[in-house]
From Swiss-Prot:
The modification Phosphothreonine is found at residues 70, 250, 255. Induction: Induced by infection with the bacterial pathogen Pseudomonas syringae pv maculicola strain ES4326. It is found in: Cell membrane. It comes from Arabidopsis thaliana. This is Serine/threonine-protein kinase PCRK2.
């Protein structure tokens, strides 16, 4: 799944920032490159979020407890960035497994993931600064924790690194792919949907400033040792709109298949863009398919276009459910989750629900599907061992409670939805 960036010409309502100041004392040489998200950008301006609260001042007032590492520290932690310890690689650079001392108990070590950003000039620097600024001041059980950072000159030039908590169970994308030796059970998929909704709700609505993720996708949802899902990779995140503005205008960046249609067409970014991406992700969980897969037959390459004909007939609806589940799910649970996806995929961005409303709907589905389990996280099933305008709360509840033939299609009018 490739990322994209296309400029949209002159963006007159783009928020402008003063020249940045390095987040680390030894990174002054890079300041000339500029960034929208440096600490001075946060503290030296007075923009206010769409909720009417002072976004940047609120961010700067939050305590930043990030550790500052040296290149030497991280070489030691990763065995000199050993290829055998590489756990991820992409356009951003490479990610290595490592260990660092536990500050609370120096006799113990903790596992970490060290992201070494590639040399992509200004864009790479901006993404590094964005992650430091955002993840340095936010904390939530469904966001991957940033532990520290490093920005330092060595013989190869300026090195930019980020140190995260280690997520041993990889990404949701991996477990939905044929590469995975295990299958995410339906109950676990529901929990992942709930965890992801919690993370987005926190970013959009639970702070005194709003963060728009902008690159919500299954590969950016990681799983910890308890299979709790956490959002990761905030390099493309943006602050929400300032007062009097309905959106943030910006270059269109993200991942093909997840980006909201109005964002692609106009470059106007709102939190409802993330809601669209969440709807696409729900259909990934249901079908086990990627949003855009060129290896599929022509009529099946775009996920949203492929599922559309099956939504008008509840008997045929089963045909889009991930066959690796082998029928081990309650069909009404799947159908109700599809209703949530359809609400998120409403063509009119203003009519999409807020993430807090989405979270409430998904939570009800989880509770109905897993009664009496004591809140325990469902487990994986090894593949080889398997046997076989704004939506109102009242309307959302009615939609979820009614599951008769044709309702799926009625909620998602094919004329109003276009696959990206």
């Amino acid at each position: 799944m490739k990322c994209f960036l296309f400029p949209l010409g002159d963006k007159k309502d783009e928020q402008r920032s003063p020249k940045p100041v390095s987040p680390t004392s030894n990174f002054s040489d890079v300041n000339k490159s500029g960034s929208d998200f440096s600490p001075r950008d946060v503290s030296g301006t007075s923009t206010v979020s769409s909720t009417g609260r002072n976004s940047n001042t609120s961010m700067s007032a939050r305590e930043n407890n990030l550790r500052e590492f040296t290149i030497g520290d991280l070489k030691s932690a990763t065995r000199n960035f050993s290829r055998s310890g590489m756990i991820g690689e992409g356009g951003f650079g490479c990610v290595f497994w490592g260990t660092i001392k536990n500050l609370e108990d120096p006799s113990k070590k903790i596992e970490v993931a060290v992201k070494q950003l590639g040399k992509r000039g200004l864009q790479g620097h901006k993404e590094w600064v964005t992650e430091v600024n955002f993840l340095g001041v936010v904390e939530h059980s469904n966001l991957v924790k940033l532990l520290g950072h490093c920005a330092e000159d060595d013989e190869r030039g300026i090195q930019r690194l980020l140190v995260y908590e280690y997520m041993p169970n990889q990404s949701v994308e991996f477990h939905l792919s044929p590469r995975s030796p295990t299958v995410l059970t339906w109950d676990l998929r529901l929990r992942i949907a709930q965890d992801a909704a919690r993370g987005l709700t926190y970013l959009h609505e639970e702070m005194d400033f709003q963060i728009i993720f902008r690159d919500f996708k299954s590969s950016n949802i990681l799983l910890d040792e308890n299979w709790t899902a956490k959002l990761s990779d905030f390099g493309l995140a943006r602050l929400g709109p300032s007062p009097g503005s309905s959106h943030v205008s910006t270059d269109v960046v993200g991942t093909m298949g997840y980006a909201a249609p109005e964002y692609i067409q106009t470059g106007r970014l709102t939190s409802k863009s993330d809601v669209w991406g969440y709807g696409v992700f729900i259909y990934e969980l249901i079908t086990g398919r990627r949003p855009l897969d060129r290896n599929k037959p022509k009529g099946e390459q775009k996920l949203l276009e492929w599922v559309r004909p099956y939504l008008s007939d509840t008997r045929r609806f089963r045909l889009i459910v991930d066959p690796r589940l082998e029928g081990k799910y309650m069909i009404k649970s799947v159908q109700k989750l599809a209703v949530v996806a359809n609400l998120c995929l409403t063509r009119n961005a203003k009519a999409r629900p807020k993430m807090s409303e989405v979270l409430e709907m998904v939570t009800k589905i989880v509770e109905a599907s897993s009664p009496g389990n004591g809140g325990k996280k469902p487990q994986l099933v090894p593949l080889k061992s398997q046997e076989t305008s704004r939506v109102e709360e009242g309307k959302n509840k009615k939609v979820l409670d009614g599951a008769e033939g044709g309702w799926l299609e009625k909620l998602w009018n094919p004329k109003n939805v276009r696959a990206c």
